[in-house]
């Protein structure tokens, strides 16, 4: 305690100090906390004031390029996390923070980088309690204005933001080290920020989340977003001697998260590699109402009000009101607006306001296919794309703003014209069919150009009677003749959805409501604190790694199981006391069973908590391993069905039938078009080659597009990773039958089919074919179907690429549409959650059952989902067991959706799935 004192001034500094011997150290594994209190008493000994806070004791060091905590080299498995709530935006209540921390701990994360600002104080208080390392970040992100980090007039602002953070947060033990900010340039003000921070807290180190490989002032370097090889080459064996922490890596926008094992193999190999923070934790969706407006055309195309777009009264009519910000009408990419005609009419009534001169996107389908938009203060542009982009501009009338005008744009196959208030104002020559591109029709926005980096007012206007026609019209616009007709007389609410605004990246490892995305199971597996590997199969010896830094493996109950396929045939418990960061050879007392031909054998190990923790109950699984055992006997040859099914051959079709089945092949197109089992039709569309899947969110982003660019790229398909796939035309295959023959052997009926799948629907011009010297790009398929008397179909499929190919195919396989009644799914493979070839070790092999609808994953932006890998067998059946069974001569992957791939490709929002 301090000696008695008197205060004559408003402030007085009193220094108190004591020696704390051998305190229990705070770590994420052992969040030991102490209460620090301060009492003020008067000379009579009566307490006049008292304050308390929670503190912890820890020490960080860097020795020989390695980061140490309490004398132990530390690996940091982190998530980046915004303060994000689907209802409250950036307001985080305590219950939500606790839920986040429970999920992080349950899925084996030990840290959070608070991107890109200090969190609310409660966040740090709870991190102290739960045991999570915090990389606390100065809120100085400049991003598009990074150059200010070099301007001396901004120095004090950088320093001031640093001071506020460090002075508030430095007594929280959870703060592992500081970050000088995010993407705020590489200038001297970053150095000043770190100088300021170190003057206030000399006990902690600093990193900086810049876009350079490193900053000279930081103690801990990046890089961010390296590949596993780049991480290894640039840092693992690099020359910079500072520890490395990837402040951002593995962008999990939408369906993503591949190669995580590869990163952590490199991290464990090199002591200097501390780990990294995945980008990022909480999906950014905000709850919005689904507000539909009626399309009065015969097609009733789904169209929805976005943002705060409003319907307002204007005289006797109701009109669309847009204020120039993120407000527009989203129209689904239905076939009726995916126009490729040689005629087009766009028409609408417009009441432009002042800000419309900033952009004025009235009716657009991307930046190329077709559109009507204002250019500056005095021009109106109409554009289409046939052999190239054609456009015509008309001068605006002097009374353009704050008056209603009728605008009509017409293309008649020879000429493009703009009409304003019934008078032709401009025209130009153009010809050819309009080319279709993968962007939706928007009213009041351009979906291709107005995304998260929009810097203009996109449409400040009121609009009414918006029409699109696949014919040339200058008057007499009848909704029943339109491809789209919106009169905005009413809106209908149909629930809610998670909005990502005008084009935010749909990052996230958990959904906005805190339910877990499938990638999290891989993250949990890769980051698990125990790992197992087989050392001696014969003796049953397994090597255990305890990757905990401070806790013994004795905190876990460990159970082993010997499985025959999915059946447990032996099991037992293990008592382990492996020290932290140590290995141990463990004997598993299994007995080799009598092997059954065709069965697989594997050893499963499960580690669960023995006691309740703040973040999970006893019994929570923290680690598991699946060790394949090299015990197998080949299947005995199956007794083949005797006899040959009957078949009939007509000019148009081949019918193969037997007891309880009938299959039909169309001889014209060479496809299997019907499968009837027990009088039930199973097929809705033919079996055919599949090279396409709906693009993933990362593939629809321009962020990494340059790495996927090739000579395939064509104008109009955007600037994204998916541009390569769209430009090659693999989403637009044209089926071309080449030959069809039938024969009969003792095996059954043999159907030999050769066909071609041409990429791009013949979109090449003659001059392109001449210059490139390639007549067609596509795949030649050789199919042999062998159908036996039991109705089993053996398919032998060989495909041969011809011509110019894309850099990669998003998928190579077969696809078919089956009856909705076949909604019961059972498979032997990895599961139960969605998994992909580069994200599959976190999903154990087993026999799983689900339904088609239950396998849906609600990514904020619809995309491919639901793959299951390493599949040995698959069944699709009705609830009565009627259906299809699939097997291959090797393990395979499958998806099954209640939606078409075309729907998944074209939908931009979950409410557009149908």
Predicted regions mapped to residue ranges:
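Extracellular glycan-associated modules
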Residues: 292-492
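A short beta-turn/strand-edge loop motif at beta-sheet boundaries
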Residues: 356, 549-556, 804-808
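Active-site-adjacent substrate/metal-binding segments within catalytic domains
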Residues: 23-25, 37-188, 245, 695, ...
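Substrate-binding/catalytic cleft of secreted carbohydrate-active enzymes
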Residues: 101-104, 111-290, 483, 487, ...
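Terminal connector regions
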Residues: 30-33, 38-51, 592-635
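Intrinsically disordered, low-complexity Pro/Gly/Ser/Thr-rich segments with frequent PxxP/GP/PP motifs
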Residues: 2-22, 564-600, 607, 615
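Substrate-binding clefts and catalytic carboxylate motifs of secreted carbohydrate-active enzymes
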Residues: 178, 235-320, 490-583, 587-589, ...
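Beta-strand/loop-rich accessory regions of lumenal/periplasmic or secreted enzymes
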Residues: 27, 589-598, 613, 627-914
